[in-house]
Amino acid sequence: MGKKIRLTTAQALIKFLNQQYIHVDGKEEPFVEGIFTIFGHGNVLGIGQALEQDAGHLKVYQGKNEQGMAHAAMAYSKQMLRRKIYAVSTSVGPGAANLVAAAGTALANNIPVLLIPADTFATRQPDPVLQQMEQEYSAAITTNDALKPVSRYWDRITRPEQLMSSLLRAFEVMTDPAKAGPATICISQDVEGEAYDFDESFFVKRVHYIDRMQPSERELQGAAELIKSSKKPVILVGGGAKYSGARDELVAISEAYNIPLVETQAGKSTVEADFANNLGGMGITGTLAANKAARQADLIIGIGTRYTDFATSSKTAFDFDKAKFLNINVSRMQAYKLDAFQVVADAKVTLGKLHGLLEGYESEFGTTIRELKDEWLAERERLSKVTFKREAFDPEIKNHFSQEVLNEYADALNTELPQTTALLTINETIPEDSVIICSAGSLPGDLQRLWHSNVPNTYHLEYGYSCMGYEVSGTLGLKLAHPDREVYSIVGDGSFLMLHSELITAIQYNKKINVLLFDNSGFGCINNLQMDHGSGSYYCEFRTDDNQILNVDYAKVAEGYGAKTYRANTVEELKAALEDAKKQDVSTLIEMKVLPKTMTDGYDSWWHVGVAEVSEQESVQKAYEAKEKKLESAKQY
């Protein structure tokens, strides 16, 4: 059956990864860029030995936390529009367990990444080994089973020859636009070093062709009829539109037929913010302009969107009595949502073909799009100039903290800097082609409403899983994707404390990243949530046991790692820090102490959250009753 080559399982894995290519729109390039690893006794003598012997073209990076390096790998793949990946290798037990949150993040966002956790012995001879857990009812269960529900594909290798079919399945999944996500291949640590006579044909160059899925004539005609029969259609731009590269087609249809664009977090920066018909973010963290347009719509054209609760305001954002839905998505499952007419096809191709079928059509929005955008831009301008007053300050988040408490924060943190003012100062100061990243807390809402990205694919938000700690780790992935650009992590103190280990990795490998740390000494977003629903401020502020506000010197922490650091508590200090940071070759961190309750509030939106049905607090009871009342106007599925 052809020539054989004797390799260990790990050597075969690395040899195979070097031969995987992807072909999109006539361009062919290697699919696997490199591998992140933290060596332990489960992988150092297998995968470690294989990489040392011959890594091929793979770039190898030593991570500092398994979740962190997997986030970096995911961010790289997401930024590369899912056309390149990094693999991630860990040891057994806790190292593998640390992948669970990162795998869930990749799965929720449909991002391909190859996870290779080591496993316990296939022979079971030394069981239980170090870092192995035991279950009385099954010896077949290991820590790696926890990765099953958060993987798009999962397998366990207990024989070398199993690797071949497993890798083919994994790469089929990772290169499928409709079901891309994390592929997990667990390799027993004794099997990693076990040799086998592999067929040489397994290691030939393999090209994974990503052909654009074509819409059928029935789909095109049905979609065109829906649009032409509508009066006020709105296009909801999702992440699938960005991965498809549908920017030009979206702009052309929007301009030709006067159809407004609104965006999900994943779809933002598919089309530049200053495009006249782009009304910005949609839903709970959306702009007033986008949400007003959506309420007027009689047709929602969803392009590559999952219709999450944040995009649909928990299914209250639209007038479901009159609005119809047209979904264009490579995923059949996503296309079926909200009783839509389904076009299961590539966004770029479909929009290009639809354009010519709409000749003679024009929406009835008239000048409304411009008026809505102007109204919102005026509000954005106001939010850029918020100033704190110690006597009578009216924060964006109202009726939570008294003036006395706000003054206490100003004194404890030595700042009077509002969050929106700081954020928009950054937007105006950093290079236009910079890439920003964020994931959790109040900052994603501020960014979706306020941030203007005028270079496509420069806004990178992980808001499928909203995983705290993705922000700093992911910035390393951005830098690997864009080595010649400035990349910025926009992160709150809560997320920074959760995970920032790959800042050290960035410094170690001279991959300059910039961390913009907003410190309001607490979990401010969740504090807003609890107080908005009748509860008091309970264990979301960072206070000491004698109720003093915690003031951490994060700049000193980062300085200890080797970063260039700055403290900026005024607009002037912030501008100066940003300008100086551009000149640095090493990673930087700018620490900003910002006042609580100065993030943006919601605009004509609602979030369905669980509220206590029974409470001794009247305010909680009222919040529950208000929630039940609002549900009466929400679509139930």
Curated annotation (Swiss-Prot):
CDD domains: TPP_IolD, TPP_PYR_POX_like. Mg(2+) binds at D493, N520. Its cofactor is Mg(2+); thiamine diphosphate. SUPFAM superfamilies: DHS-like NAD/FAD-binding domain (SSF52467), Thiamin diphosphate-binding fold (THDP-binding) (SSF52518). It is an enzyme of class 3 (hydrolase). GO terms for biological process: inositol catabolic process; isoleucine biosynthetic process; L-valine biosynthetic process. Keywords: Hydrolase, Magnesium, Metal-binding, NAD, Thiamine pyrophosphate. Thiamine diphosphate binds at E66. Its EC number is 3.7.1.22. GO terms for cellular component: acetolactate synthase complex. It catalyses: 3D-3,5/4-trihydroxycyclohexane-1,2-dione + H2O = 5-deoxy-D-glucuronate + H(+). Pathway: Polyol metabolism; myo-inositol degradation into acetyl-CoA; acetyl-CoA from myo-inositol: step 3/7. Binds 1 Mg(2+) ion per subunit. Binds 1 thiamine pyrophosphate per subunit. Residues 442-522 are annotated as: Thiamine pyrophosphate binding. PROSITE patterns: TPP_ENZYMES. GO terms for molecular function: 3D-(3,5/4)-trihydroxycyclohexane-1,2-dione hydrolase activity; acetolactate synthase activity; flavin adenine dinucleotide binding; magnesium ion binding; thiamine pyrophosphate binding. Belongs to the TPP enzyme family. HAMAP family: IolD. Involved in the cleavage of the C1-C2 bond of 3D-(3,5/4)-trihydroxycyclohexane-1,2-dione (THcHDO) to yield 5-deoxy-glucuronate (5DG). This is 3D-(3,5/4)-trihydroxycyclohexane-1,2-dione hydrolase. It comes from Bacillus subtilis (strain 168). The gene is iolD.
